[in-house]
Amino acid sequence: MNYQNEQNAYQMQNQENVPPMSYGYPMPTPEQFQKMSYGQNFQAPWDMQQQIQMFQQYHQNFQGGYSDPFTYQNQYAHQPKIVTVTLQDPQDLWKELHYLSNEQNVLNNGRKIFPALNYKVEHLNPESNYKVEILLRRMVPYQIQYSNGSWSRKNVQSKKTIAMKTEKVFVGEFTGQDIMRTGLDLSDVKVFNIGSDNKKKVTPYEEMSDAEKREYDTQYSKKKTSMLEVSNECKYIPVLIINEILPNQELRLVGEFENEITQFATVSSYKNHIVKALRTAANPTSRGDAKQEAVQVGKQWRSSNKSLLESLRPSMICTSVSTTAPSTNFHAPLQYPGTSSPSSNFAPMTPSTSFDSAYSSFNVTSSTPEQMCYNPIPSMSTDYSFCSFDSATSSPPLQPTATSPEASQNQIKLEMNQYM
């Protein structure tokens, strides 16, 4: 590496938009890569070996373009960031109702979720198509009851089995550009139920006549495709599901997102009169004296609780509850040239985690089913650098050999200094 290249590397190393290279060392030259990967007495950390593999692949397959791997590495700093979903609540209605323990009135013929669910989505691929769905997840595995101004666990066991998740309801297919420009408006999403333990007895399906069964099946199937089936006296939270539609029409999960302030209890009639007033006052379909009265009740309540409401600062950013991605990471694991696909069992790593603490967190000679790996390109997911491999399905492409983590760690530092 000549002096000019060293200067270029140093400048790139210190650009704000380029994170530190692996373990804080500058990116090696192709010649140093060659020594690292094939030298008899040197074993680089295997995350560095992933970089070696990536850049060897680059030099073998990339025709023309960048003159050195530093420019190639820098391109990753400009990749889309982690997908974020933010709940839109311009009137603070979700915040206020969450403080009061929100309630959602449910009828057999369906009711729209209110307040409306509106989301802002950032960092999608503008040229990709996305499939958007929604479901409701139960917050607790038991029914609840309202008593003495608060909700508590219901002592009576339900006679029917209540699913912990509803079926998904299709919202639509959109381009990433449209979603990011206009957001996602889910104001038409409805919830329904098919009776309650506290209501008049419903004829069991087994006791219906054939004609009644056909009618029931027809109506039920229509509801299930357009509405979310819930049970009364349960606490639910909406979960937004975004899948990228790949060129082969397969789906890649981007994330399943929820915000805690959108949870609600399903009821056949409102229990808290303040909740009812706030919802009635804000609902554009409400009319007449009932709405005027609700507006006055809402004003009085907000006035008497002004300082409290101003102190409430709930996060509008949705968290990911995806089963194929960690709650703090919204992307599938990055795959590098020539590597196996890692599994989705992540453990988060903070940007402040040092090399010593990171490296000592796993045993490089371990033969256990799961091996920890460090993301060789931190700019792709700076906050979430650890992932694990499941040896039953895949394995790390390269691994260091050492007698102990401590010895390997010291040897790596010494030998990297030698080559750098």
Curated annotation (Swiss-Prot):
Species lineage: Eukaryota, Metazoa, Ecdysozoa, Nematoda, Chromadorea
GO biological process: cell fate specification; positive regulation of DNA-templated transcription; regulation of transcription by RNA polymerase II
Compartments where found: Nucleus
Protein name from the UniProt record: Putative T-box protein 33
Region (Disordered): 395-420
Predominant subcellular localization, coarse grouping: nucleus
Gene Ontology CC terms: chromatin; nucleus
UniProt biased composition (Polar residues): 395-412
